[in-house]
């Protein structure tokens, strides 16, 4: 069995990847402009941290390693500003959000790299449908065994990350009725899912990967589209379920939340085996209903996810005080309780404009750090795109059995 070396990292360090949308400011559809944007940035100090993604309407920001979310936020703001300046120069805009509200997958162009071309050939239309946008959070760990323990420890909290970050209610001009529709695209791939519960340490992880390779199911860990996975070459655990938030500020709040949760989990016993029983159901509830979903705890109790999150924030606050991140977690908690998640904000924007193109325009403004109420210079007449179903109202429409 081939060993997989694990590069040791300092515990509790963090970093993020953000997949972002490139927008045509004339009609607010996606723009296939990543090559032009990367060329514009080629001589900029942040150039090595900005990468292409699977289709040319996407771009990815990669942070450095940080000990504190404040340093992460400063770096992400620097990269955002550089990216937006370069985007202005090539005539496009940039936004967050887990999906573009009305793009058509048939119109996407695969990026010209060997891996992306292979994925397009292997997965057909799924590769172009994979024009969705996620945030990946990396947490430093000292060893492979520690990585496996942390993956298992974080797994019951996958719904919390999904609901807090959800920003993909619209897809191809339709209100999907999901808070997070993006993960439905991810789950189409054969190796989506999670680390098997029986993989208890790094030795068993290596054995599992060897089995996948021997049977021709996977060539490398990159082929595993798991919700959370070890990243041995970085020395991290990678949380992959978050939609890209609408702002870099929210992205860094989520990273701070993950950091505090990882520290808390180091001090608690591993979740019981029965915690996996409701994994898929909890996952669906968070995607479909967001913070209003139901949640089955590792102990088997059915509660509202928002209530479980409130209790979790109480447990996290002493850890946040130790880490010096109390203000960041308090802001995330308060924003959750006051305004919900980005999916709710997007639906409110659609209610205001009644056009999805207007919603995308607001997305580009808030990503730049502007108020959604601020208007940029007048643009050319834009394509009128209306959602083909009404946005969700309050979640009193729940089936009774969920209460």
Curated annotation (Swiss-Prot):
GO molecular-function terms, A-Z: ATP binding; glutamate-cysteine ligase activity
A Gene Ontology biological process term: modified amino acid biosynthetic process
Location of the region described as Disordered in the Swiss-Prot/TrEMBL record: 370-403
This protein's name: Putative glutamate--cysteine ligase 2
Lineage of producing organism: Bacteria, Pseudomonadati, Pseudomonadota, Betaproteobacteria, Burkholderiales
EC number: 6.3.2.2
Species whose genome carries this gene: Bordetella avium (strain 197N)
Reaction it catalyzes: L-cysteine + L-glutamate + ATP = gamma-L-glutamyl-L-cysteine + ADP + phosphate + H(+)
Keyword field: ATP-binding, Ligase, Nucleotide-binding
Disulfide bridge partners, by residue number: none
Record family assignment: Belongs to the glutamate--cysteine ligase type 2 family. YbdK subfamily.
Function of the protein: ATP-dependent carboxylate-amine ligase which exhibits weak glutamate--cysteine ligase activity.
Coiled coil, from the record: none
């Amino acid at each position: 069995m081939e060993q997989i070396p694990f590069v040791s990292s300092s515990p509790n360090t963090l970093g993020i990847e953000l997949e972002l949308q490139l927008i045509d400011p004339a009609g607010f559809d996606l723009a296939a402009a990543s090559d032009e944007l990367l060329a514009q940035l080629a001589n900029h100090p942040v150039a090595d941290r900005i990468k292409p993604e699977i289709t040319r309407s996407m771009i990815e920001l990669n942070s450095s390693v940080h000990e504190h979310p404040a340093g992460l936020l400063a770096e992400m703001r620097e990269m955002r500003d550089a990216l937006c300046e370069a985007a202005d120069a090539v005539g496009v805009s940039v936004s967050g959000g887990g999906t573009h509200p009305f793009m058509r997958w048939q119109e996407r162009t695969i990026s010209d790299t060997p891996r992306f071309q292979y994925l397009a050939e292997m997965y057909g239309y799924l590769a172009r449908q994979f024009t969705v946008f996620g945030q990946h959070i990396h947490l430093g760990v000292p060893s492979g065994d520690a990585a496996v323990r942390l993956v298992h420890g974080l797994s019951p909290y996958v719904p919390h990350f999904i609901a807090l970050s959800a920003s993909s209610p619209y897809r191809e001009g339709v209100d999907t009725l999901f808070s997070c529709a993006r993960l439905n695209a991810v789950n189409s791939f054969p190796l989506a899912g999670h680390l098997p519960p029986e993989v208890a340490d790094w030795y068993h992880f290596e054995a599992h990967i060897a089995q996948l390779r021997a049977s021709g199911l996977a060539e490398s860990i990159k082929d595993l589209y798991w919700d959370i996975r070890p990243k041995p070459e970085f020395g991290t655990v990678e949380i992959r379920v978050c939609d890209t938030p609408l702002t870099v500020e929210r992205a860094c709040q989520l990273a701070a939340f993950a950091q505090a949760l990882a520290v808390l989990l180091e001090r608690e016993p591993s979740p019981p085996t029965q915690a996996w029983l409701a994994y898929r159901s909890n996952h669906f509830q968070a995607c479909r209903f967001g913070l209003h979903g139901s949640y089955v705890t590792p102990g088997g109790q059915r509660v509202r996810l928002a209530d479980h999150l409130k209790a979790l924030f109480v447990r996290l606050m002493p850890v946040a005080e130790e880490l010096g991140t109390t203000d960041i977690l308090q802001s995330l908690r308060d924003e959750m309780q006051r305004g919900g998640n980005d999916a709710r904000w997007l639906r409110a924007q659609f209610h205001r404009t009644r056009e999805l193109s207007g919603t995308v325009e607001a997305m580009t403004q808030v990503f730049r750090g502007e108020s959604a109420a601020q208007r940029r210079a007048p643009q050319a007449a834009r394509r009128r795109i209306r959602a083909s179903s009404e946005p969700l109202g309050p979640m009193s429409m729940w089936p009774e059995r969920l209460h």
